[in-house]
Amino acid sequence: MPFGKKARHVKAYQFGADAPQEGMEAVLEQHRLRTDYYNALVEMELRQREERTALLANLAAESGLESPNQVYERLKAAGEKGIRKHPEYVAARERQKALYGHPRLLELQSRQREERNALRRSFGAKGLYSSNYLDVERAFDKARQSPELRFRRYSPHEGRLAVLYTEGLPMREIGSDTRVQLPLPDPIIYRDRATRRKHQRVLMKFRVRSVERQPLWITVPVYLHRELPDGVCREVSLHWHRVADRLRWTVSVVVEVEGPPVASPTGRGAVAVDLGWRRVEGGLRAGFWVGEDGAGGEIALSEGDLKQFSKVEDLRSIRDQHLNALKEALAAWLEAPPAPLPDWLAEETKTLPQWRSPARFAALFRRWQSERVHADEAAYGLLEGWHKRDRHLWQYEANLREQMILRRREQYRVLAATLARQYDALIVEDFNLRAAAELDQGGSDLPDAARRYRTIASPSTLRDALVNAFAQRGKPVRKLNPAHTTTDCHACGGALVGDPAKELRLYCPTCERFYDQDENAARNLLRRAQEVQAQV
């Protein structure tokens, strides 16, 4: 760290909000432009990747060499395994790197950069606010690190707008800035709950875009339930997402503050956490922790929590049953209506037996409600009754789902804070939870029940809570290779006997005892961390 510089870190604060009091059209316009800009960047990147690949292949051919793609296809046709580590493929990649400084490639890259700048200018001319296109570019640059880029679907029911402070803005000036004006309440209101609840609501002015260099503001009621720290503001963003038939609004404030002081040792050493999900007696296990002081325990959602998550699924099932019954009854009525159908109704419902979305039936109800048909009482009554019941069940389902997700997150945060206070370092497995989730969705051999339990346990939420809790307190987080942590005995190093997918407790022939496989994995992580530390 340079002399005289203080360690700093970034903290994000999220607050509840109400819908903007005006300017919703401008909000949706910016959201649409953001989506279009992101998709245009994706389209451009995919095309530019093809151009770079083709040019590199031509340069390699001119040199009389095979490109990495050609080597890959040749080895694949020959039945080789592990091609990306094959010496010929590795050598081809190294040869390609030598071409990166070729004048023709540098010229192409320069032209492609200018194309991106021109695209930015074109969207700026369309009215996309500068902070929003910078925010989109930040998200895109992160996404383009992945080999697979995906387009985004526009939805008015979910989105965000952002104001970025690249140079930073002192928090004391956030109430009078030209981009965001967020009045900060007197700190005295946070001394007791009653006073805080009475005075936490403030009106934030948020700049959506500029019109002839003048700001176009929207006013958003925000509930500052906790005090914002003194520091440097880096970002203020407005978020919304749909919960059933209404929008839930939040405001996020990102503040750069002085780093936490160096934590004094607790004397209890490190704690290792093995992440996993399995049904156990009394609930759903999401992980197991073991400390160097010998303490340990499972991280689990209770039976009551499981029942509530199951209730969400039950509500969805009930809605599906009601929808199928409605579809069958309406189809029968439409086949033999008591009076000729108007053209719009016949055209609208000609594919009704294939409809699967409740939204299509709801749209049909809204139109039928304003364009009643002669002798339609029976069919319209069915549709009206279904719409009323389904709206209630939809609200029940969506609110319960969000409630349980927030409850789970809070439980994980409380546990993470407790461990971070008690221990000096965190040890977790280094593996890609997102890839595991995508594999589950892509048709893996994982049983449906295990896939469902993974979704409920949400190990990524648990890991994020743990990592954030230790990082906020200035304590290190170490990620270790998880290979064989479950199947190797932590006590003797021998192989455990049993099927980890079916049995919780595995047997060690050497120790002649059974071990909880999750506790065993956590102890192996702890032992490996100690071995690594001893080598330093």
Swiss-Prot record:
Keywords in alphabetical order: Antiviral defense, DNA-binding, Magnesium, Metal-binding, Plasmid, RNA-binding, Transcription, Transcription regulation, Zinc
Annotated region (RuvC-I), positions in chain: 271-481
Region Target nucleic-acid binding (TNB): start-end pairs: 482-516
Keyword Zinc belongs to the record: yes
Cofactor: binding details: Binds only 1 Mg(2+) as opposed to 2 usually seen in other Cas12 enzymes; lack of the second Mg(2+) results in loss of target DNA cleavage activity.
Residues noted as binding Zn(2+) in the record, renumbered to the chain: 489, 492, 508, 511
Regulation: Pre-crRNA processing is inhibited by EDTA.
Annotated segments matching region Linker: 258-270
Region feature (Wedge domain (WED)): 160-257
Binding site for Mg(2+): 518
GO molecular function, a single term: DNA binding
Region (RuvC-II): 517-536
Ranges where the record places region Recognition domain (REC2): 60-105
Chain spans, region Recognition domain (REC1-N): 1-59
Free-text note regarding domains: Has a bilobed structure, with a recognition (REC) lobe and nuclease (NUC) lobe. The REC lobe (residues 1-257) is formed by the discontinuous recognition (REC) and wedge (WED) domains, while the NUC lobe (residues 271-536) is formed by the discontinuous RuvC and target nucleic-acid binding (TNB) domains. The crRNA-single-strand target DNA duplex is bound in the central channel between the 2 lobes while the non-target single stranded DNA is bound to pockets in the REC and RuvC domains.
Record's protein name: CRISPR-associated DNA-binding protein Cas12m
Organism of provenance: Allomeiothermus silvanus (strain ATCC 700542 / DSM 9946 / NBRC 106475 / NCIMB 13440 / VI-R2)
Gene that produces this protein: cas12m
